[in-house]
Amino acid sequence: MKQKTWFVDAAHIGHPPDFFALTDERFVPTYMARVKAFLDRQKPLATYINQEIWARRLRRTYRNIRFEPTTGDLTTPKIKRDLISTHLTVPVSAKFSDMLACRETDNALSDLFISIFKAGFRRIDDAVFLDCCESAIAKYRAAQYSAQLYAPFKGRIDGTDIMYQITYHATPTSKTCAVALWKERQPKQQFNMTFPLIAPKQDDTVISTAEYTPAQGAVLQGEEIRFGIQTGNGIAPHPDLIEHTLLLATLEDITGPTKHKPTPGRLRLV
């Protein structure tokens, strides 16, 4: 089976407030179809997403669609260089508690964010991922910005026993939460996801990233994705968790700007 490459442009996370940019023209139609299918199934999303706008625009074009939080507007399609690019922004008006009935937090984490993530990473079990998110946010709030907190759990992905661990990194200006997933008997084949709990303001520069190319034999086999690892603002992911880290989403305002610029890394997924 021929490998397909998905590109995620980390430069579009935070400034401007785009979720990510996909630059593989062949992948975009399938991806947008998944997003639309999810929206069609989620009636509660109508409170903060105009599903008709999505459906109408998705049928017309999939090129460079941008979803702006709070407004729900889609901007005019544009071509990024000679590549087809799709921009999505996580809508932050929905409360995390609305989705999981998690009363410990008022952080905004929407169903659409879950959908967008899972559209690209289809083999993550719903229950495991949601449990990760719920535990991560709740424990993060309870820890009151402690430097690091580890919470290992057991779960199953595609019938395989796995361990997943939530790690927190906090500084005065930026905070992240990383969730590590790995097979119990293959700890080196580990997949981590990292997302900031506090996002940059619109006039700030991009969240800093660093280039990382996984060593041979230390990556999951399958499709390839280009991504950015967040290492700026004093944040350094735990050495055990730095492999295969993906910057996912921004949830709140950051308290200070960052001057670093992103460079891409790459990750292989099952």
Placement of each model-derived feature along the sequence:
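Structural motif
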Residues: 172-180, 232-239
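Acidic, small-residue rich beta-repeat scaffolds with periodic aromatic anchors
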Residues: 1-119, 201-270
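Solvent-exposed serine/threonine-rich low-complexity stretches and specific carbohydrate-binding patches
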Residues: 190-200
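Structural core positions within WD40/WD-like beta-propeller blades
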Residues: 160-166
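Solvent-exposed strand-loop boundary residues in beta-sheet-rich modules
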Residues: 185-187
